[in-house]
Structures are given as structure tokens and as C-alpha cells.
Amino acid sequence: MSSAAMDTKHFLPLGGRTCADTLRCTTSWTAGYDFSSQVNSSSLSSSGLRGSMTAPLLHPSLGNSGLNNSLGSPTQLPSPLSSPINGMGPPFSVISPPLGPSMAIPSTPGLGYGTGSPQIHSPMNSVSSTEDIKPPPGINGILKVPMHPSGAMASFTKHICAICGDRSSGKHYGVYSCEGCKGFFKRTVRKDLTYTCRDSKDCMIDKRQRNRCQYCRYQKCLAMGMKREAVQEERQRGKERNENEVESSNSANEDMPVEKILEAEHAVEPKTETYTEANMGLAPNSPSDPVTNICQAADKQLFTLVEWAKRIPHFSELPLDDQVILLRAGWNELLIASFSHRSIAVKDGILLATGLHVHRNSAHSAGVGAIFDRVLTELVSKMRDMQMDKTELGCLRAIVLFNPDSKGLSNPLEVEALREKVYASLEAYCKQKYPEQPGRFAKLLLRLPALRSIGLKCLEHLFFFKLIGDTPIDTFLMEMLEAPHQMT
């Protein structure tokens, strides 16, 4: 007699019949069947087996043919018995011993098991049949419900290192492996290292002992299928990527050469290096109006600003009306950037193009202290801290100049393309000149919002009062742009 039939004395009577009577009808297919081969580890979880399942009624009136029919077509089942123990009710009829798990026969193919494969089911953790089938918590994403009994092992092996058994981080060089074995194999191949074994070349390689013998570890890497050529191909791809980056940088510099931008800065640079305390003009307690002096210096700088713009690559190729629009939109920011960078060596003040030094106290006395302090803290101080050079200043000013959002442009996309070229050239310059400062390019760009905000505030407070007198700015700029380009 089978072990299943011998345990019938533990079963409770159902409907006037003993469960032993019910079980006898299944003897023909349960005898000699190894249930353990079909037990899914996820069904033993405390959360129970989730999902929608149907099972045939185990009833004495069903012979073997009745059982087979019920397995093939659940709709032909007699009225099932509802078990208060497992709470499932229809479409389940469960044989429930007082101790241990109950047994149900699912007929739903969605579980991934063959029809009629028995399952172990926890009677105290049943769920609604309308829920989706999910793996129990704790193994979700690691072990999946297999399509066949051996699927659990096939899925599990993808998540362990084939060399040492540690947790795999993915497929590396053809084999699922951990980061440690991946790095070990890559170093060995790239450096062309050779190892020797102190024992008999059959050392145990596992998670704890993988570092004891490098020879055996490397041999196991090869034996499990790691490919040396995969490492070499990876290195070649990295080399090609670096070459492409260099070519891209060179291409960007050819379109918008930073050397030309630097030449433009030097060409319009005022000769203020020889000023002394005597000719600074505005001492801290000077009665002179600092706003008037700033406006006079800005008026002078407008001439050189047009000259500077003409020297920026591709600016003169734009339509004349667009050139006027761009200068009109950015002149205040362009001048502020210039005198801010010129004032890096000055303490608590700014140095104008005329050689005059405006102290912070004078600005506060004139009622423009708030905006003056913003210039010192958000521009001058930041430029000083990062030691911004002339090339970087010129590129930032070129970015301000090529503003595609300026109203009235005939071709904003062309202006935007020129700005993108300046971005690319500046980034390539930072990488080449300051390789130890990977965030320098971003730091430079972060000065632009502050420059924009300060420029707008300066206009609001008439910081450049009477900048060009009674001459309309459009007419003034138009005359300057139509003048021949004086190369000095």
C-alpha cells in the first residue's frame, strides 16, 4: 500500500464518507509518484501560493476517467466541497489533515506546471483567486516561477558567479560572474599576467577562497567560458571612443576656434595696467558721482564692443539686422562681464575701462550699493576664486552674444547653432587646459544666470544712466556696424 493510503487514518470524515475512501480513487496515479520533484520552493513561503487556480473534486464517484475529465475541463466538475479551513471554497476541494500542509491539484496552465501536477499548499495563507500570481516576498526578482520544474535552477544560476559562487552582477566576457572575478580576469588579460599554483593545480575556488590561488582562479575563469578576446575588444572600443572624443573636440574648435575669441578679447582690452592710487579717480570718500563715471566708461566701451563682436567667428556672417538685435539685447551683460573680470585684482571695488576705480563705499553713497554688492559677490568674487582666464571670459561673452531668444531675429536657429559651437569649444578647452577640474565647464556656465539677472537689474536702476545721450541705440549701433572693420 502506498504511503498516501497508509496515512488515511488521520483524515476527518467528509459527507458520511471517510477521506480514505476518497483517496482510494487516486491510488492509481499517486502510487510511486515522487511529489518532491514537483514542489516549487516558492509555494513553501509563509505568504502561500498566490494566484487563480482550479482543482478537480476528489470524490469516490469519480473513477480514473472522472479524474482525467475533470483535469481537462474544470467546467464539468460536480459541485465542489467548500473547506472552512483554507477559506478558498469553489473551485477548490482540499484534503485537509489536522497537521501538516494540504494537497490540491491545480489545472490552470498559467502556473507553469503540467496539468495534474500536485502542489503543496498552506491552508492558513490562502488568497483570493482574482490576484495575480507573484513570487513570495524575499525572492521577487531573483527566483521566478519556472515554466517547468527545472526552471528554478536555470533561473537561479543566472544570478550566481560561475567562478566563485558569489552573487553575479551580470554577464561579463561571456559568463555570469561577480564584480571581483570580472575585474580579476580583466586585469590578468590586459596586463598579460602569469600565475603559478603552489599546490596541485586543483585549488578550491569559492567566495571565501577565491583569492588564495590566482592560477587556479584564472584557469577556472577560462574553463567556465570567459573570453580573453572580449577584454581586448572592450579595450579597443574604449580607445576608439577616446579618439572620437578628440576628433569631436578638434572639429568643434575648428568651427569656433577659441584662439580667435581670445584675440578678440586682447584686441579691445583697455590699457589700465599702469593706473596708480593717484589716478584711481574715486577714493572711498570721493564726492564724484560713481554712476556718471560708470556711464561714461560704458559709453566709451560701446565702440570697442562692436569691434569685439566683429572679431567673434561667424558673427559678421549674420544679417546686419540680426547683428544689431544681438548687440542691443546683450550689451549690458557683455560690459558687466568685462569690468567684473577686469576687477579680479581689485579689493572691494571695480576697475573701469577708463582706469577709474569705483569703491564699494562710493557705490553705496550713490544709492546703487545693492546691485554693486551683487556684482562683487556673484561675479568678481567667483571669477577670482576659480581664476577664470581670458579665453573663458571671451567664450562666456560669445555665449551671451549669440542669444537665440533675442526678439526679431530672422533666423534664430542659426544663432542657436553658433551658441552650441561656442559651448562645444569652451568644453573642449576646459578639458584640455584644466583636466584636473572636470566640473570647471559647468562652473563657468553657472555664472551666466547671475550675469543675466544683474544685467536686468542694472537697467532697472538706471545703472548706465545717460549711456549714449540722445542718440537712439538702434541708430548708434547701426552706424558702428556699417563702419569698415578696423584690424588693429
Swiss-Prot record:
Q: Region Disordered: what ranges?
A: 232-256
Q: Which GO terms describe its cellular component?
A: RNA polymerase II transcription regulator complex
Record's keyword annotation contains Mitochondrion = no
**Compartment list:** Nucleus
Renumbered to this chain, region (AF-2) spans 473-484
Specify which residues bind all-trans-retinoate according to the UniProt entry for this protein. R342, A353
| Ranges of Basic and acidic residues composition bias in the record | 232-244
| DNA-binding region range list | 158-233
Positions of the UniProt region annotated as Hinge: 227-250
Q: Where are the residues of the annotated region Required for nuclear export?
A: 374-394
The record ties this protein, via Pfam families, to: Hormone_recep (PF00104), Nuc_recep-AF1 (PF11825), zf-C4 (PF00105)
What's the family?
Belongs to the nuclear hormone receptor family. NR2 subfamily.
Chain's role: Receptor for retinoic acid that acts as a transcription factor. Forms homo- or heterodimers with retinoic acid receptors (rars) and binds to target response elements in response to their ligands, all-trans or 9-cis retinoic acid, to regulate gene expression in various biological processes. The rar/rxr heterodimers bind to the retinoic acid response elements (RARE) composed of tandem 5'-AGGTCA-3' sites known as DR1-DR5 to regulate transcription. The high affinity ligand for rxrs is 9-cis retinoic acid.
Per its record, how is this protein called by name? Retinoic acid receptor RXR-alpha
Which species is this UniProt entry from?
Answer: Xenopus laevis (African clawed frog)
